[in-house]
Amino acid sequence: MVQAVAVLKGDAGVSGVVKFEQASESEPTTVSYEIAGNSPNAERGFHIHEFGDATNGCVSAGPHFNPFKKTHGAPTDEVRHVGDMGNVKTDENGVAKGSFKDSLIKLIGPTSVVGRSVVIHAGQDDLGKGDTEESLKTGNAGPRPACGVIGLTN
């Protein structure tokens, strides 16, 4: 069993923890999250980005992690980035909490997400269904109020 965590921090009052757990390379990864400081009753884009770099804030995390060179999509779409985790939904207090399993996100093997960044966005991800070229790259999810590097835990 491999476990990893990303502690999300930023300059907009958004913070949280995202945990990852994978039993073997062929098994799906369980992702659980609790993120506070968002707008209440909203959906916010939630992605794994290519770089584990926060030297210039969350913008240094680069684009979505996309080792297979696909276009952006929903987590349930066949064509999507590995880093496309869709949207998180906040409650009346601006807290998003939940978990899901994902077969493309790996902690083990050549497409491991360890050392990359989790980013929570300021806007809703259109899941690649928008009518702009940017939709197929980013989902038009907007600015990056918080991020954190995915690191192994014991």
From Swiss-Prot:
It comes from the Eukaryota. Its EC number is 1.15.1.1. This is Superoxide dismutase [Cu-Zn]. Cu cation binds at H47, H49, H64, H121. Keywords: Antioxidant, Copper, Cytoplasm, Disulfide bond, Isopeptide bond, Metal-binding, Mitochondrion, Oxidoreductase, Phosphoprotein, Ubl conjugation, Zinc. Belongs to the Cu-Zn superoxide dismutase family. Destroys radicals which are normally produced within the cells and which are toxic to biological systems. There is a cross-link at K19, K70 (Glycyl lysine isopeptide (Lys-Gly) (interchain with G-Cter in SUMO)).
